[in-house]
């Protein structure tokens, strides 16, 4: 029986959860932390904000948001992989963040009321959902008017030679890293497949606007291998 995208992604993350953080560092050459740090600066999260981290995984960005909003704020992380959430829960406990909570749920149908959050993030998760636009619209729905929705995701370089090297790395090298470091060749082959089929930064910016966002800001990182998209929900 052929798996749906949702079923395959769920299987992947339920399998690789123990080595997910290590592999993120190996695959991105530790750059993912710098990308997230710069994205956080651009977001200008305020103390006391109420934030949601969609597809939170092992909760690294969730915890960064928790630090930014402070104990007078509130952060919720949501993911459909219970195993990834187990790792995330341990991290939240280690950081003693009582204002941060994690929840099992589906990004396609966010279990929150309209206009609940000041900021909504999704980090390296949008490419894994069955319907990109549906998730963007859901994030638009739950963010407050004037609030921000931010996506940090893999992208494709535009410089021809670099683009060819990048595609070779993702297709040939990264699955081997997955086999060596995480014992998961098949699972990490999914990452290159999902990255190759994901919209480029211009198309994703257009999708943000189609979902209803204004003042869409785009920031590529490391020659375009990753990219931040930030959109604001209009006040009208």
Swiss-Prot record:
Record's keyword terms, sorted: Menaquinone biosynthesis, Methyltransferase, S-adenosyl-L-methionine, Transferase
HAMAP family with a match to the protein in the record: MenG_UbiE_methyltr
Residues that coordinate or bind S-adenosyl-L-methionine: 58, 79, 106-107
Record protein name field: Demethylmenaquinone methyltransferase
Pathway(s) per entry: Quinol/quinone metabolism; menaquinone biosynthesis; menaquinol from 1,4-dihydroxy-2-naphthoate: step 2/2
Known EC number: 2.1.1.163
An example molecular function term from Gene Ontology annotations: demethylmenaquinone methyltransferase activity
A family per Pfam: Ubie_methyltran
Species annotation: Alkalihalophilus pseudofirmus (strain ATCC BAA-2126 / JCM 17055 / OF4)
Role: Methyltransferase required for the conversion of demethylmenaquinol (DMKH2) to menaquinol (MKH2).
GO terms, biological process: menaquinone biosynthetic process; methylation
InterPro entries: MenG_heptapren, SAM-dependent_MTases_sf, UbiE/COQ5_MeTrFase, UbiE/COQ5_MeTrFase_CS
Reactions catalysed according to its record: a 2-demethylmenaquinol + S-adenosyl-L-methionine = a menaquinol + S-adenosyl-L-homocysteine + H(+)
Protein family per UniProt: Belongs to the class I-like SAM-binding methyltransferase superfamily. MenG/UbiE family.
Signal peptide start and end residues: none
């Amino acid at each position: 029986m052929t798996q749906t995208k949702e079923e395959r992604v769920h299987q992947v993350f339920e399998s690789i959860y123990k080595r997910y953080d290590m592999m993120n560092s190996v695959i991105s050459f530790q750059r993912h932390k710098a990308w997230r740090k710069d994205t956080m600066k651009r977001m200008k999260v305020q103390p006391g904000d109420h934030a949601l981290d969609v597809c939170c995984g092992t909760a690294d960005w969730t915890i960064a948001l928790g630090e930014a909003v402070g104990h007078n704020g509130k952060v919720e992380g949501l993911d459909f992989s219970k195993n990834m959430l187990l790792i995330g829960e341990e991290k939240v406990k280690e950081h003693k963040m009582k204002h941060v909570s994690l929840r099992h749920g589906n990004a396609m149908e966010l279990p929150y009321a309209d206009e609940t959050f000041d900021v909504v993030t999704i980090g390296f998760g949008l490419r894994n959902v069955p319907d990109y636009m549906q998730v963007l619209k859901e994030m638009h729905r739950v963010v407050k008017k004037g609030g921000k929705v931010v996506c940090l995701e893999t992208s494709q370089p535009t410089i021809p030679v670099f683009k060819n090297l990048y595609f070779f790395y993702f297709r040939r090298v990264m699955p081997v890293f997955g086999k060596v470091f995480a014992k998961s060749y098949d699972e990490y082959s999914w990452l290159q497949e999902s990255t190759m089929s994901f919209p480029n930064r211009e198309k994703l910016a257009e999708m943000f606007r189609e979902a209803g966002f204004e003042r869409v800001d785009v920031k590529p990182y490391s020659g375009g291998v990753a990219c931040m998209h930030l959109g604001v929900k209009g006040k009208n």
